[in-house]
Regions:
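Short, Lys/Arg- and Gly-enriched loop/turn segments at beta-strand edges
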Residues: 101-107
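Composition- and surface-driven signal marking solvent-exposed, interaction-prone regions
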Residues: 17, 108-110
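Helical hairpin unit composed of two closely spaced alpha helices linked by a short loop
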Residues: 12-15
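Acidic (Asp/Glu)-rich catalytic clusters
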Residues: 1
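Short peripheral tails and domain-boundary helices/loops at the edges of structured domains
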Residues: 112-117
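His/Asp/Glu-enriched, well-ordered alpha-helical/loop segment
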Residues: 7, 17-99
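Charge-dense, low-complexity polyampholytic segments
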Residues: 83, 107-108
């Protein structure tokens, strides 16, 4: 299986452009989200990467972006039998996203993440 990794804030930091995530989404490609490193990013934050995608690619639903940051990443590294979703037998980390807009199912500038488990 082929997965496309994107680190949008790093892409902007280095190239001042983003991968064509709207096209990749419309084609049904498997995308996963990363942060790259501090040499090409101001901080390592998955929620910031997700907020960036939401602000630039408004047509991509939050549910898909969350999947890109969870299950798709686990599948890409071959760890989906342990991580990436709440399934019996798995032991995923649990991260709470606070200050999301539940009416529009979107992240806001105030959205933050907090690791619970």
């Amino acid at each position: 299986n082929l997965y496309w990794a994107t680190c949008p804030l790093s892409n902007w930091f280095i190239h001042r452009q983003y991968a064509p995530l709207n096209l990749m989404h419309s084609m049904g490609l498997k995308v996963c989200i990363g942060t790259d490193s501090l040499s090409s990013n101001h901080r390592l934050s998955m929620i910031d990467e997700m907020k960036c995608i939401m602000s630039v690619f408004k047509e991509i639903p939050l549910a898909d972006i969350i999947k890109w940051g969870t299950l798709n990443g686990a599948e890409a590294i071959g760890a989906d039998n342990l991580l990436g979703s709440f399934t019996i037998g798995k032991k995923p980390g649990v991260v709470l996203i606070e200050n999301a807009d539940l009416a529009t199912l979107s992240l806001t500038e105030q959205s933050i993440s907090k690791r619970l488990v």
